[in-house]
Amino acid sequence: MTDISAVAGQPALVRNELNLVWLDMEMTGLDPDTDRIIEIAVVVTNSTLDIAVEGPVLAIHQSDETLAKMDDWNKNTHGRSGLIDRVRASSVTEADAAAQIAAFLAEHVPPGKSPMCGNSICQDRRFMARWMPELERFFHYRNLDVSTLKELCRRWQPAIYKGFQKRAMHTALADIHESIDELKYYRERFLIPAAPAGETA
């Protein structure tokens, strides 16, 4: 677990109900009933995204039979990243991972307070509800999905939409940092506060 605060000397992240829990998982496919989780990572930020701390990054063991059922895209992507080898070498189960993540999160945010934050996060939530239900219940029922802003930008401000280039590394921790960076990008360019009443340019 590493402090990823950008500014030297910044205060540590204080436990607060307004802190945001960012999560990403890599899976063997898209169907939570037949596919499995193979990697999970979390990052907790303060509400303004200025201070952050990384949590556990865990490859989750799955059988060779489960890995063999992956389609070519998943085999190629997770093979190139080294994740398949990490999954085979791991002894961490889904229950182990859920317990480690929950213990880390409890140090930084009270249960039931943070929405689940990320990109297309409803998909992660579906898998978590299926395979890590106790961890899923740690979160508030709401989601903070950066994909919502992405889709609105694509329709309303296409130039801004095209300005953020994703690296598409498809590892859980890298994807989380990219989601946080993407939200900062939209905050600066798309979510522009209105001028106070009576203020003129």
UniProtKB/Swiss-Prot annotation:
GO biological process: DNA metabolic process
Residues of the active site: Y141
InterPro entries reported in the protein's UniProt record: Exonuclease_RNaseT/DNA_pol3, Oligoribonuclease, RNaseH-like_sf, RNaseH_sf
Database matches in Pfam families: RNase_T
Keywords: Cytoplasm, Exonuclease, Hydrolase, Nuclease
Listed CDD domains: Orn
Domain of life: Bacteria
The EC number(s) this enzyme carries: 3.1.15.-
Keyword Transmembrane part of the UniProt annotation: no
Cell compartment(s), UniProt: Cytoplasm
EC top class named in words: hydrolase
GO molecular function, a single term: nucleic acid binding
Residue ranges of domain Exonuclease in the record: 20-183
GO cellular component: cytoplasm
Keyword Nuclease: yes
Record PANTHER family: OLIGORIBONUCLEASE, MITOCHONDRIAL
Family note: Belongs to the oligoribonuclease family.
Described function: 3'-to-5' exoribonuclease specific for small oligoribonucleotides.
Protein name per the record: Oligoribonuclease
